[in-house]
């Protein structure tokens, strides 16, 4: 095997390049020689044939895993997908999908894409691709079969609820945008809502457009939802904060070993007229760039932070491209908020790093706050360090369901989504607009009985009394999916907010957010 043959020369090159500068360097050289011996022994003597490329890749992954939870190795295949995610586009047909009952099921066609132009609808099942059955297709196969170069075509056969005959469609692939913003709308006549899913290269452009639209609709206060936003590009997060800051305040600073990793990022003292109050909503899934935004809003007293203590990912990674198309993502610095708080939470035991995320001691109550280091905001308020962003107002999402409710909501067949398809046409015929539907339609009485009968027909086990306990939440999930099917994703999220206790908590704290900015 070529790589094994050349390993001794690679090691010699490293030695000649760096030299024996210390006993540590000599020890490292010996360890590298030992590694070469082990690789050769395994390749020549192991009882079964092994894929040495896979083993060597595992060794690389193991090396980086020893550093911290976020330094990692990315294969060439993964690098391409990640690049598409951060670039904000890929080439394909443009659907959001899930796999239900073995088939690709359309959650929604992305507006303006080939699937949208061809008339694909929420609930459509793709049963054949290029005249071959798509039954029991995997997520990986979906990407391989439906993505492809712009201008190439793919034939799909659609099974649509309520229509007996399948529908044959030829889709010509195109560039597909990956939107950072999942939803942007007015909750009421003064409150705007924006949910950011990730920070990609298009995020600033998207949020600029969304803010402009909401301001034109009369927005006087903003709920910025960063829950379960795992982060993304640091520069996009900094630019978003910059939109709301009118002085040359520090937004973020980083510290590392190499000189270029020590940076201070300041606001540009812009003239954008965004003097309305902001409430930022975070949870344990808010990480990295989300914590840059929420931490800066909090430290600069520009917005009130509501929710749960965030993830605590404050390590800056730099991606180093390797010759085979793979990438080494290596931590080069740490993030600090304007007040000096380290965003990164401790990771001495990497094995427990993710397991500890769900512990109750991350709550923002008096007993846990007493154990955290205290920092001071621009206007002298106390904020807390120790990893992650501790919210100003603690609000935990209430999802403590009984067994029957939990089984319905977490079922792999997405039962609330499926039942929404059963009642969509009835509602579409009855209501011309979302507002009337949201105000007058419910699933009580005979409609509830219809749902319970439908569950029985699906052979789903449940206790009626248990579903009764959480019926308001269950019907909200169903009706939100109906709204999404008929009026689009914006209305799915608008309906979901009605039963979202964290969002409802956030809405009652705008007076405090208003006081922060002197209004």
Give residue ranges: language-model regions.
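Conserved functional hotspot residues or short segments at active or partner-binding sites
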Residues: 342-343, 347-519
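Extended, small/polar residue-biased N-terminal targeting/export presequences
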Residues: 46-107, 153-173, 177-183, 496-507, ...
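Amphipathic alpha-helical interaction segments
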Residues: 37, 54-58, 62, 239, ...
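Hydrophobic beta-strand signal
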Residues: 127-128, 304, 329, 344, ...
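Hydrophobic membrane-insertion alpha-helices, especially the h-region
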Residues: 5-21
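A generic structural motif
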Residues: 157-161, 336, 376
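Cleft-lining beta-strand/loop regions that shape enzyme active-site pockets
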Residues: 3, 20-31, 35, 39-52, ...
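Polar, glycine-rich mid-to-C-terminal structural blocks
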Residues: 289, 301, 312-373
């Amino acid at each position: 095997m070529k790589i094994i043959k050349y390993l001794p020369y690679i090691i010699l090159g490293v030695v000649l390049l760096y030299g024996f500068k210390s006993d540590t360097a000599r020890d490292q050289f010996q360890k590298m020689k030992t590694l070469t011996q082990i690789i050769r022994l395994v390749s020549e003597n192991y009882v079964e044939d092994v894929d040495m490329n896979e083993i060597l890749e595992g060794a690389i992954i193991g090396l980086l895993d020893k550093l911290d939870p976020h330094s990692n190795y990315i294969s060439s295949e993964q690098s391409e997908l990640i690049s598409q995610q951060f670039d904000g586009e890929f080439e394909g047909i443009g659907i959001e999908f899930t796999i239900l009952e073995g088939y690709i099921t359309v959650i929604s066609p992305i507006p303006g894409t080939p699937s949208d132009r061809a008339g694909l609808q929420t609930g459509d099942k793709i049963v054949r691709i290029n005249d071959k059955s798509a039954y029991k297709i995997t997520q990986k196969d979906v990407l391989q079969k439906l993505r492809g170069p712009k201008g190439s075509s793919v034939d799909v056969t659609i099974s649509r609820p309520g229509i007996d005959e399948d529908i044959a469609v030829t889709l010509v692939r195109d560039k597909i945008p990956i939107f950072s913003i999942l939803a942007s709308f007015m909750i009421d006549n003064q409150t705007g809502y924006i949910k950011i899913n990730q920070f990609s290269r298009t995020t600033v452009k998207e949020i600029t457009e969304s803010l402009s639209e909401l301001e034109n609709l009369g927005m006087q206060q903003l709920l910025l939802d960063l829950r379960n936003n795992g982060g993304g590009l640091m520069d996009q997060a900094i630019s978003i904060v910059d939109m709301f800051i009118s002085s040359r305040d520090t937004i973020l600073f980083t510290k590392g070993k190499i000189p270029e990793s020590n940076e201070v990022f300041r606001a540009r003292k812009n003239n954008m007229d965004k003097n309305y109050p902001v409430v930022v909503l975070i949870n344990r899934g808010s990480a990295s760039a989300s914590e840059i935004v929420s931490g800066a809003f909090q430290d600069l007293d520009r917005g009130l932070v509501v929710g749960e203590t965030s993830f605590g990912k404050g390590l800056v990674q730099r991606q180093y491209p390797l010759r085979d198309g793979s990438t080494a993502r290596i931590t080069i610095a740490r993030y600090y908020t304007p007040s000096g708080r380290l965003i990164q939470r401790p990771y001495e035991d990497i094995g427990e790093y993710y397991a500890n995320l769900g512990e109750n001691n991350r709550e923002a109550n008096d007993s846990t706050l007493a154990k955290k280091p205290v920092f001071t905001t621009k206007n002298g308020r106390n904020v807390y360090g120790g990893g992650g962003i501790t919210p100003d107002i603690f609000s935990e999402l209430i999802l403590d369901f009984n067994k029957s409710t939990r089984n319905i909501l977490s079922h792999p067949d997405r039962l609330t989504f499926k039942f929404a398809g059963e009642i969509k046409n009835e509602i579409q015929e009855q209501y011309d607009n979302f507002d009337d539907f949201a105000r007058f339609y419910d699933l009580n009485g005979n409609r509830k009985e219809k749902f319970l009968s439908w569950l029985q027909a699906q052979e789903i086990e449940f206790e009626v009394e248990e579903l009764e306990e959480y019926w308001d939440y269950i019907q909200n999930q169903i009706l939100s999916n109906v709204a999404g099917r008929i009026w689009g994703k914006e209305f799915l999220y608008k309906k979901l907010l009605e039963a979202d206790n964290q969002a409802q908590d956030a809405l009652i704290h705008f007076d405090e957010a208003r006081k922060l900015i002197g209004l």
